[in-house]
């Protein structure tokens, strides 16, 4: 009986988080760099809060007052969420670090872990039914490239993984056909 109650509680919490994400994505008041990065930082902190993975955030006190389209926010959020999920699912990490910066006209979000890593030089299969096909990495890359950015993955077996999302701010205001 207690397992069922815990399961219902976990499911309810997941539904509430999903609803919060939907409301955030569709609210036009959040169409700024400052709102987006603040939300992403808080989301990362909350995401790891009950997991045993220590999470450090490196976020500037203030971000430039730059608009972001809702599509860009949505794709950026889903890519970052996938990177965080990969840390929990695959890395066996005890520590994560999320860094957010605006440099050289770009938004840069770096998600690092101290987990087991993988051979990032190994070819990625295109077989979507294969368990080792790196669907999450492919999805993150597609989401970010669809909004004009790039996703850089660096990983070494035994040393962890770093995923860097780079988004030119000049394209971040445009609605994109995806």
Tell me what each language-model feature is.
Residues 1-178:
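Coiled-coil dimerization/phosphotransfer module
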